[in-house]
Amino acid sequence: MDRLKYDIVVLGAGESGVGAALLAQAKGLHVFVSDYGKIAPKYKEELNRYAIPYEEGRHTEAIILEAKEIIKSPGIPDTAPVIRQAVAKEIGIVSEIEFAGRYTDAFMVCITGSNGKTTTTMWLYHTLCKAGLDVGLAGNVGFSLARQVAYDPHPYYVIELSSFQLDNMYDFRANVAILLNITPDHLDRYDHRFELYAEAKMRITRNQQPEDCFIYWEDDPFISRWVAEHPPVARLLPFAMEARTDNTTAWINEKNELVVMNLNSPFVMDEELLALSGMHNRHNAMATAIAAKAMDIKNEAIREALQDFKNVPHRLEKIARVKGVDYINDSKATNVNSTWYALESMKTRVILILGGTDKGNDYTDIENLVLSKVDGLIFLGIDNEKLHKFFDGKISRIADACSMHEAVSLAYKMASKGDTVLLSPACASFDLFQNYEDRGDQFRKEVLNL
């Protein structure tokens, strides 16, 4: 650390940060990586291999605050002291996606939304691959965009974007932008103000041109109002559960067919043939089909991809049937709206495992579904007081668990033949688990050990 002035300082040494460091070095920039926590061995080994200087367990301000530009990993809040100091010194702060976008002319398909973005990203990636395109998968899934731009470039990218990534994007342009929905989530990062969170999501349309496309859920009142008040310059391609206007591009007709119009040849497909069930997956399928049609993918390839796609892990993932009881892993449901969609898709009585780190949740949204479908609740978390306050007296069987082993054991005892045990926590996982993947993996392990 003898050189104190770097062109780029990367904060955070996960996939996003290390990818950004690799690209910065490949472009001849002097780069330094700083992580306040511990760097995973595989990333430390990579930084050593490329001789990129780094630190862990601290943020050395003397180095960071002398940088020409900072690339901030999405997990670091703007309230972090080092970020506040950098802003005060007027040091530019960008996301890894923004940085990577400077070094590629690839066609960018970007997906955001409070729920469904991983499924839609993977479904669209699957569709484009099936159509024969050379496409990279980036953002919150796959390898970082920066890493791919540096060492494995593609002419097309499908990118899942969180609101945190969109916050630090300024010049990046999405050729196709998809906004699936906006519901309260991560409000702790937005001063508990929904409008600030929603504005971050709408940044996906920033820098779009008339030849670009903006695909959005027309049934969402906030999105529709925003589009009316701030008309994007891109071509508008909305989808809805039924045709609302002449401009509606995709909907479900009276024959229960998914219809896409206004894009070259019409596309019609029986919704029963879709690989994934549930109302939310009809939305995801419509967005996928519109994007593929907008990119001139043939109907055959779209139809095939919509039929044979396999769902992503931790999203309504069926683990096993044990003594006539289905066990479903929906650990990726980290907000109430995701849990609403999971419950809506259930066809049996449910034992529901809820809880974790609350992000300002309002459980009123799932109350009716819980009352009509749930026979037992298991609260999995260190602090379940808010859940008890809301649900006590409404469901007769409620239990607390402080480990996944205990939660699955309780669910096993509560469930009857024909029921479904559903892990759909509606909360973040950081009180008891490393992340939602760890939570889902532990659920899978415990179920398979029954």
From Swiss-Prot:
Origin superkingdom: Bacteria
Class of enzymatic activity (EC top level): ligase
Pathway note: Cell wall biogenesis; peptidoglycan biosynthesis
Pfam annotation, one family: MurD-like_N
Keyword annotations from UniProtKB, A to Z: ATP-binding, Cell cycle, Cell division, Cell shape, Cell wall biogenesis/degradation, Cytoplasm, Ligase, Nucleotide-binding, Peptidoglycan synthesis
Keyword Cell cycle included in the entry's annotation: yes
Catalyses which reaction(s): UDP-N-acetyl-alpha-D-muramoyl-L-alanine + D-glutamate + ATP = UDP-N-acetyl-alpha-D-muramoyl-L-alanyl-D-glutamate + ADP + phosphate + H(+)
A GO term from the CC aspect: cytoplasm
One GO molecular-function entry: ATP binding
Location relative to the cell: Cytoplasm
GO biological process, one term: peptidoglycan biosynthetic process
Role played: Cell wall formation. Catalyzes the addition of glutamate to the nucleotide precursor UDP-N-acetylmuramoyl-L-alanine (UMA).
Family membership noted in the UniProt record: Belongs to the MurCDEF family.
Protein name as annotated: UDP-N-acetylmuramoylalanine--D-glutamate ligase
